[in-house]
Amino acid sequence: MGRRKSQAAAERNLEPIKISTDSIKKRPRRDSNEPPFKKFDDLEMFETYLKGESWDNDFDFLHARLDYYPPFIRNEIHDDPEKIKPTMNNKSKKFVRNLHHHVDKHLLKQINDMVGIEYKFKREEEKLPDGRLIWRYKDESDHGFEGLDRKWTVEVDVECSPNDPTVVVDMRSIPID
């Protein structure tokens, strides 16, 4: 991370964390089988939430949804939704290529950094009849915490539509009994 990026991350309190077996406690008692649902429209708030859940020891029991314009779109339109072009959607190969780069090189890496666990996501692609494109990233590994009763799966769905450049990221972390 460059000096300006690390300085900006420190100001936002988004420094990456690393979870070790020493920091993992016994699974907390929960009143529901479904994790609480949180919805965000800002990438930084989403990252802050993930970091907070890790600090609260709830990294294995969360459901968060992020609806946002990816950074490459925001940079092109200069944060002015009026400048969105009709070609800024998943019908454009350039949009899909840039989104794929953003997700693989930035979003999933930030999720790993904020949660403090190295997820090894495997991707499946699905194109729906209505034109929506969904990439399903899934991780079912045990993350090296043998001996602890904390096993979970993580699913991250990234969805984009043929109508606009909005990207929907749906992250679910579900404990396995």
Curated annotation (Swiss-Prot):
InterPro entries: RGI1 (IPR022554), RGI1_sf (IPR038235). It is found in: Cell membrane. Keywords: Cell membrane, Membrane. Residues 1-37 are annotated as: Disordered. GO terms for cellular component: plasma membrane. One of its GO terms (biological process) is energy reserve metabolic process. It is a peripheral membrane protein. Pfam families: RGI1. Belongs to the RGI1 family. Involved in the control of energetic metabolism and significantly contribute to cell fitness, especially under respiratory growth conditions. This is Respiratory growth induced protein 1. The lineage of its organism: Eukaryota, Fungi, Dikarya, Ascomycota, Saccharomycotina.
